[in-house]
């Protein structure tokens, strides 16, 4: 047996992956206190002790058109990671999300005798379904946080473990709205809207103006409307402030550093980009509207590739439309405001929606960090 510590390679490509990676590292450190973690990491993973060869922001690119502009740099990083991990020979490599980057990297490393895990499943059930064969060749195991994903992989005999979602473990089934409001300085009886224009720079650039103009329309209906805008880091905050100064300079908003969860729990309704934020909003039991816009060519291509009728995780989990989705040309202030207005009403329909959110929460509350850590350790080969 080697005297070196258990060594885990990790690559996370965006904020949601950073959160998952940090939880996995915490759970592994509890089981193997001396373990070493190295790769591409965001601030949360680095805070847990992951050595970063590259910053996560290097990989955080959205859309096909946008990726093309960064392709030479991304390919150079992947070549370098392949070489460095192959030399290091970690006990296990875990690619966290970022499938277009990580799955090829996982395949490269598997060819060098390294056991690989992909965490979490890309949306192969929704589009580019033939990727399942590449994933099967590139990985020893897929970790999935949605129950229907494992059933999809089982059809193709690709090893997959349903572990639930870390956010479902971390959030209470019945969040305390008044405590969240007190934390954020929001009056108990005020109407409150959360705006979440995304974690990536391209999303914030594309969505902020429409989201701000929607808030302007809603304040005409609710003069007491409090608007909270959680932003993932200082870059996104500066970007949002720049857009706001030209679009809605007189609109009073609460800009928050992080605190997305508190903002969702405190709010009567949320307007957000699709992605992990929609799942978090569901777990916060906050009614929402999803608004999303891409570059025209990227959207044109997505329309032809996507195999599901919805893009947001609450709708996909429920198998029906719980949440209004307004995409591309439908993502306008008038339409967004019209969809948000009913969410502020204290009606039986809204109570029923929150009950459904609780039911879905329970389905994916499975102690995911612990399960993911156990899956990693089961793949460790004695040296």
Curated annotation (Swiss-Prot):
GO molecular function term, any single one: lipid-A-disaccharide synthase activity
CDD domains: Glycosyltransferase_GTB-type (cd01635)
Entry EC number(s): 2.4.1.182
Signal peptide per UniProt: none
GO cellular component: membrane
Keyword Cytoplasm: no
Domain of life where this protein originates: Bacteria
Pfam families per UniProt: LpxB
Keywords: Glycosyltransferase, Lipid A biosynthesis, Lipid biosynthesis, Lipid metabolism, Transferase
Catalytic activity: 2-N,3-O-bis[(3R)-3-hydroxytetradecanoyl]-alpha-D-glucosaminyl 1-phosphate + UDP-2-N,3-O-bis[(3R)-3-hydroxytetradecanoyl]-alpha-D-glucosamine = lipid A disaccharide (E. coli) + UDP + H(+); a lipid X + a UDP-2-N,3-O-bis[(3R)-3-hydroxyacyl]-alpha-D-glucosamine = a lipid A disaccharide + UDP + H(+)
Pathway in which this enzyme or protein is active: Glycolipid biosynthesis; lipid IV(A) biosynthesis; lipid IV(A) from (3R)-3-hydroxytetradecanoyl-[acyl-carrier-protein] and UDP-N-acetyl-alpha-D-glucosamine: step 5/6
One BP annotation, GO: lipid A biosynthetic process
InterPro entries: Glyco_trans_19 (IPR003835)
Family of the protein in this entry: Belongs to the LpxB family.
Function: Condensation of UDP-2,3-diacylglucosamine and 2,3-diacylglucosamine-1-phosphate to form lipid A disaccharide, a precursor of lipid A, a phosphorylated glycolipid that anchors the lipopolysaccharide to the outer membrane of the cell.
Protein name per Swiss-Prot or TrEMBL: Lipid-A-disaccharide synthase
Taxonomic placement: Bacteria, Pseudomonadati, Pseudomonadota, Gammaproteobacteria, Enterobacterales
Primary gene name: lpxB
